[in-house]
């Protein structure tokens, strides 16, 4: 007992080391989450489009949905590391926000189980029982879309300490609600962008005629992302500084170049997307991830530092009682328990 400590505030690495690990692990997790969401959304939309008799058999829709299995497995597995790192680095804010979000937070697991089972059933029934496929697909994708709503809400609340008391009183502030909605829509838009890009390069080899539709989805989703991103930036204006502004600027520039490459007047191959997308989309993804990391660290690091300072003050208050506590603790350690008298005094005597 050489120091008074709090296990939740101890960190196995330096803050910078944890930030680096969080950036890498969360980036990988988010990438596969976006691919998984985009695949589920596009698979359902293409299936419903074909149901109207526009494109004949559902072979390509089934091909899109079949890739969901591997993507969802990677998304779930890669999500463990960033979740654990956030619990260690920002324990006070994390456990407070998830406690306030407790019912929704606990619903994540059953929602994921239901979504994955329904989407698998959707893929297996789309050619045999179309009505059952519609039922499973709509419910499965709906359940899947609820999960990022919960996560973005919890993260938004975690980063806004001033909203904790109001949220506990069931008072959802207009600013917080708007930021939550914009953040959620931005995630869904990103899922369309990266899902369409993924299948543009990896699912059109045997169906080159589908590339045009995926290019259109990619163009439209990127344009919508820019529109949503403008008010989203204003919703975090308090935390803006030059590193964040620089990262956002790089991301916007990359998005504009993506639109230029994909513009309807641009020449294109029906077999695949422009190779420049293989550079522009990673730049767009990393730059926005950098901006998010800076914003999160700016808002959460002071909360952790305040908790550490409170622990140190508490340690000073308890310091005069340290010797007394150690004496009582040492007396207990010196007690011999392998005799009948001690066992009787400690266990039997209170009742007999």
Could you say what each language-model-derived stretch is?
Residues 1-26, 56-60, 82-103, 154-182, ...:
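Membrane-interface interhelical loops and short amphipathic "cap" helices
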Residues 21-26, 58-70, 125-145, 212-218, ...:
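Alpha-helical transmembrane segments and their helix-start/interface "positive-inside/aromatic belt" motifs
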Residues 32-44, 105-121, 185-201, 249-263:
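Hydrophobic cores of alpha-helical transmembrane segments in multi-pass inner/ER membrane proteins
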Residues 69-137, 228-255:
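Membrane-interface helix-loop-helix modules in multi-pass inner-membrane proteins
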Residues 126-243, 247:
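Long, contiguous internal "core" modules enriched in hydrophobic/ aromatic residues
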Residues 267-297:
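Internal/C-terminal transmembrane anchor helices
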Residues 311-343:
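Electrostatic cytochrome c docking/interface patches
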Residues 342-352:
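C-type cytochrome heme c attachment motif
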